[in-house]
UniProtKB/Swiss-Prot annotation:
The chain crosses the membrane at residues 32-52, 68-88. It is a multi-pass membrane protein. It is found in: Membrane. Keywords: Membrane, Transmembrane, Transmembrane helix. It comes from Saccharomyces cerevisiae (strain ATCC 204508 / S288c) (Baker's yeast). This is Putative uncharacterized protein YDR467C. Partially overlaps PKH3. GO terms for cellular component: membrane.
Length: 108
C-alpha cells in the first residue's frame, strides 16, 4: 500500500512525500523519518527547528489514527508552539474545523 505524508510549512507551501509500506511499524518509522527530515529542511531555511521524540510521535499517531490510510498534516503556527494532525478521516485541527485539538511541540 502507498501512503502519503503531507507537510504544510509556515509559508503555506505543501510538501508531499509518498512511500510504500507493508506494516504499521514501518509506517510510523517512515513518518518519523520524514518529520525529522522536514524539520531539518526548515532549520536550514532559518525557521524554528521542530522535533519530537519517537515515543511521543507514536503516541500522537495512535491517538488520532483510525484508518489504515495515513494522511499526516503538520501545520506549524507562528512561533512553532503547536501543530495539528490530520490522519485518515480523523481531523484534529486548529480553529473551527475538526475537533480543534492542538498539541504542544516538544523541542529537543
Amino acid at each position: 500500500m502507498i501512503y502519503m505524508l503531507v507537510f504544510l510549512d509556515r509559508q503555506q507551501l505543501v510538501h508531499i512525500f509518498l512511500f510504500r509500506s507493508r506494516g504499521t511499524t514501518n509506517i510510523i518509522k517512515a513518518c518519523y523519518f520524514f518529520f525529522l527530515l522536514f524539520c531539518k529542511l526548515l532549520n536550514a531555511a532559518e525557521a524554528p527547528l521542530l522535533a519530537i521524540s519517537l515515543s511521543k510521535f507514536v503516541w500522537l499517531l495512535l491517538r488520532v489514527c483510525k484508518t489504515s490510510y495515513l494522511l499526516l498534516l503538520i501545520t506549524m503556527l507562528e512561533g512553532a508552539e503547536y501543530f495539528s494532525l490530520v490522519v485518515g478521516n480523523s481531523i484534529c485541527g486548529s480553529g473551527g474545523e475538526g475537533v480543534g485539538c492542538r498539541y504542544p511541540v516538544v523541542l529537543i
